[in-house]
Amino acid sequence: MRRFALLAALVLPLTAAGATQTAPAAPQASTPAPETAPAPAPAAPAKPTLATAVAASTRTPANVARDKYRNPEPTLAFFGIKPTDTVVEIWPGGGWYTEVLAPYLTAGGGKLYAAAPDWGRSGVDKLKAANPALYGGIQVVDFPVFDGKAAEVPAGTADAVLTFRNVHNWRMGYRRDGEPDYSVDAFRQIYAMLKPGGVLGIEDHRLPETADAERERTSGYIKVSTVRRLAEDAGFRFAGSSEVNANPKDTADWPNGVWTLPPSLALKDQDREKYLAIGESDRMTLKFIKPAETAKP
């Protein structure tokens, strides 16, 4: 009896102690980690447009101020210039159109040639030096070439050749002593540059058809019929005209020719407000096509 009591005394505390132990918690189901969404694909670069090229902050403010006269976006649209084109700009001068064309073509994978004699390259040279990233890809070549020199734009490679306010210079024999009119040779060389189906775009100061043709040699104006004859004699087909650069206020009859009007204002302060009110010249905008080669039988 005493042994039983002693055994009970030992067992009861152990039982009580065991009763206070907490049963091990049942394992909880693990929550799967949320799947990470794939990173969005980078946005494709915006397709270059003429509108964005014209609106670019890299353009010279003085050039932008002349947009109301020169109308770059509708002019280039009329010529059908695409950002993937190979374009030759003939005699770019101070680079007014170069500031629009170079970024547009660079962004689209196109190519720009600036074609001018040594004395006509300073504007493009300044652009290239000031902003190599934007203008460094411009290929500067000679034009027109004389004395049997080889053309520097490979034949049949250009999608478009553009020249702004220059045909009258060739007709006048500008800076070409002893060769008063080299326009025929200039058009022949342009024709050779273009691919079959390529575009020649011309903008120039328009002389009325009723005016004396001799004024083409002194006034800076030239007749549409003269330009068409030069182009068509070189083999081009006339593809249309636009009045986007027309100015009915310009009579083309001024004391110092077209240079009487802005931006030249050759008379300085004499009648300055009168000529500013007229604005820049009345200009033709003509498009020509180099015909596609006829398939041989």
Task: Enumerate the language-model features and the residues they cover.
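Conserved Class I S-adenosyl-L-methionine
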Residues: 212-241
